[in-house]
């Protein structure tokens, strides 16, 4: 048959083995003599069968030679993995055993990466993740890529460890140090949804995250769900793929130490927030204090030293060592401790620091209450020009108001408030701040001034002669009003007295007090121009004041006054 003469049958290039049926017990000479003829008849074409029969083994048992399906052992790269020495023939210390294990594992990974034997068997593979594609539509998470990346990361960690433990260690020739090592630390937002882990990790103005990066030397980024606000996310596929994962911190560094240090810092923040209440979290309090300092609203009371003892943790008015009496003083303007009213920073501009009693006693001022109420009242007064106070009364001065005794003299009458009571001044008893020249003595109670007894040295109503109710007219002891009393008689010698001598009651001169004369040896000086009648010694009295009726006639008992002398 023609097909038997062909050296290659079909597309199979592997030569066929010798035939197993028939001719095995025949003479060997026939086969030997037929071999050259057949070879020569085919014009040098190699036959599919073996031309030389192997010699039988010494024990007479024929064995079939098994061929390796991968080729020769010298060319088989995978077969070299089985030749790695794993038997330990000497007594090694623990450090030597660890170094040998590192070296053996690094060599094994290097050979797998060299022959591209990275994908394990079907039974050892894990379920494949969903496919991911880059901007060009190429899949980035293929099976070969994922397993190669895993082996490269493992070899990088082992090489870093071997370079520290094994002296003069040289990594494999095909080893390339990666630019960065990254690792993910997941945040338990599902277990603690009420805790703001992102705010604690980032901090005010990102200072907490920057501090952790500076301390560890690694780059820390927050990725995953919830890391980017809605409407501010990027549209690229790589960023969109990170948004599908859970919230995590992506740590990137060039060495493993930096990554571990950054992981420790991130774990510390997460564990502290999850185990300690928010009010007792020191990190949260420091962040709030730092944010207040950045905004300019910080009042650092905790770290401020006490002005009394110098210790930190309390103010001077709460100091246990009471050595400074100023710390116990309470300001009556703002209600705070540690300063007087004259030094109060909340005192209104232009107001007096004294808070005298005066007549009015303790009248409520506008400034009483907390600082917010005082500022609001002051603002309303400045805007409206006279806003009512908290008690509905017209606004008054906080200190040195219209009812504060001697401070009332610099206040205009129309600026004075209503009187503190409806009782007449002469009916008020027990006024401590009266002078000795007021309206009568304390023991007279509610008696009017004209009914009060005259005291020595007083110069009120009825004190001087010629006035209303003068003692000479007997009106000091009567209870009638001066306008209901009879006119007193004129004093003798009224022509030389000052005032209206002919009209009693109009300021007659005091008895025994005449007009002063000229000094010895001098004449009476002339009166000033235009005022001849108002000068002492003037002969003619001034005309009576105009009125509705004529002046009363003089009493009939008394003689008429003498005519004026020329």
Swiss-Prot record:
One Pfam assignment: KH-I_KHDC4-BBP
PANTHER family: RNA-BINDING PROTEIN RELATED, SPLICING FACTOR 1
Biased composition (Basic and acidic residues): 341-352, 394-413, 429-441
Function of the protein: Necessary for the splicing of pre-mRNA. Has a role in the recognition of the branch site (5'-UACUAAC-3'), the pyrimidine tract and the 3'-splice site at the 3'-end of introns.
InterPro entries on file: BBP-like, KH_1_KHDC4/BBP-like, KH_dom, KH_dom_type_1_sf, SF1-HH, SF1-HH_sf, Znf_CCHC, Znf_CCHC_sf
Family, per entry: Belongs to the BBP/SF1 family.
Lineage: Eukaryota, Fungi, Dikarya, Ascomycota, Pezizomycotina
Organism: Aspergillus fumigatus (strain ATCC MYA-4609 / CBS 101355 / FGSC A1100 / Af293)
Name of the molecule in the record: Branchpoint-bridging protein
Bias (Gly residues): 355-364, 457-472
Ranges of residues in domain KH: 186-266
Main location: nucleus
Subcellular location: Nucleus
Keywords, ordered alphabetically: Metal-binding, mRNA processing, mRNA splicing, Nucleus, Repeat, RNA-binding, Spliceosome, Zinc, Zinc-finger
UniProt-annotated stretches for the region Disordered: 1-77, 341-367, 382-566
Gene3D superfamilies: 6.10.140.1790, K Homology domain, type 1, Zinc finger, CCHC-type
UniProt keyword Zinc, yes or no: yes
PROSITE patterns assigned: KH_TYPE_1, ZF_CCHC
SMART domains: KH, ZnF_C2HC
CDD domains hit by this protein: KH-I_BBP (cd02395)
Coiled coil residues, start to end: none
This protein's GO CC annotations: commitment complex; cytosol; nucleus; U2-type prespliceosome
